[in-house]
């Protein structure tokens, strides 16, 4: 089993992945002042619930991505504790199967690289990934596997929280999918503007990207808030809540020391004689179409 760690602005996601299948997912709060020992204590709580005397949790290796540099080292130390090996840390220098077509690859969020790499390996090209989290991010990979860049917007919950904090007469609202575009009270108006507004954003930005690419693109959506938004989208899409964790496992396959794995999407990196090693199943080419 591979230990995948995704350090986000709000939460740290831990995933156990075996043979391309996500076996478990757990979350911890992202606390920038925690030490490695404190994070290890939190991880111990997570793993203690999954231990069995006859089937202990064992990790053959770890892979880590982070958008919070202050705690990357602490979580990397934790990963090494549980695996006995240095983790694969996502950066522009590792094998991804992509060509970075942006001026400064180091400025691209590492989670964006992970999403794009997995989507490019498993879906028809060109492909657009959208991650609905603290920020809403779009990533674009063209038909030649070139990472072209993307779009960054305030996240759905970030916008709702800002309204509640900055507007004295607007309440905090619990997320749900609005039934109508026209709200009849303050809460339903806010939900329509935020949730339906995000769905329209996805449709509109995707259409503009397709115009610039000069051809239709596959749309893949992930993130904890996507379940509220995707039913309202009109562009055909695939929703995969585990996209990033699967992407981390793919990058582990490509970069783990002394291991030679074939690329999950069938793309063989130049200069490497990879043998096939239990690749991820290729996602169905059909995408789900949901209309608002």
PLM feature spans:
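Short, hydrophobic alpha-helical segments
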Residues: 47, 123, 252-256
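A short acidic, often aromatic-flanked loop/helix-cap motif at beta-alpha or helix-coil junctions
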Residues: 33-35, 94-98, 243-247
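ATP-binding/phosphotransfer module of carbohydrate and carboxylate kinases, centering on a glycine-rich
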Residues: 2-4, 160-292
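Phosphate/pyrophosphate-binding loops at sites that engage ATP/ADP/AMP, CoA/4′-phosphopantetheine
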Residues: 43-61, 205-217
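Short beta-strand-loop/turn "lid" adjacent to the catalytic site in phosphate-handling enzymes
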Residues: 51-107, 144-150, 155-156, 184-195, ...
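Phosphate-binding/catalytic loop of phosphoryl-transfer enzymes
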Residues: 85-166, 195-208, 265, 275, ...
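Short glycine-aspartate micro-motif
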Residues: 2-6, 63, 127-131, 220
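Short glycine-rich, Thr/Ser-proximal phosphate-binding strand/loop in the N-terminal lobe
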Residues: 2-45, 55, 146-171, 176-180
């Amino acid at each position: 089993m591979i230990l995948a760690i995704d350090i986000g602005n709000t939460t740290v996601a831990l995933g156990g992945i075996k043979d391309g299948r996500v076996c478990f997912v757990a979350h911890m709060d992202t606390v920038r002042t925690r030490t490695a020992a404190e994070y290890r204590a939190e991880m111990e709580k997570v793993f203690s619930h999954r231990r069995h005397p006859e089937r202990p949790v064992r990790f053959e290796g770890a892979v880590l991505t982070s958008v919070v540099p202050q705690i990357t080292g602490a979580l990397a130390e934790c990963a090494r504790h549980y695996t006995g090996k240095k983790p694969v840390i996502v950066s522009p220098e590792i094998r991804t199967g992509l060509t970075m077509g942006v001026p400064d690859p180091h400025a691209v969020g590492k989670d964006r690289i992970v999403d794009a790499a997995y989507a490019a390996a498993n879906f028809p090209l060109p492909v657009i990934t959208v991650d609905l989290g603290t920020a809403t991010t779009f990533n674009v990979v063209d038909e030649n596997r070139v990472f072209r860049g993307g779009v960054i917007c305030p996240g759905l919950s970030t916008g709702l929280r800002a309204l509640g904090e900055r507007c004295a007469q607007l309440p905090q609202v619990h997320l749900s999918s609005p039934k109508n575009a026209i709200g009849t009270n303050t809460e339903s108006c806010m939900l329509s503007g935020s949730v339906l507004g995000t769905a329209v954003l996805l449709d509109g930005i995707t259409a503009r990207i397709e115009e610039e690419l000069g051809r239709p693109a596959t749309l893949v959506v992930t993130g904890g808030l996507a379940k509220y938004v995707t039913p309202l989208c009109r562009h055909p899409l695939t929703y995969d809540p585990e996209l990033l964790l699967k992407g981390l496992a793919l990058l582990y396959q490509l970069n783990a020391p002394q291991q030679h794995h074939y690329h999950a999407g069938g793309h063989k990196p130049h200069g490497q004689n990879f043998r096939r090693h239990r690749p991820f199943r290729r996602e169905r080419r059909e995408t789900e179409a949901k209309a608002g």
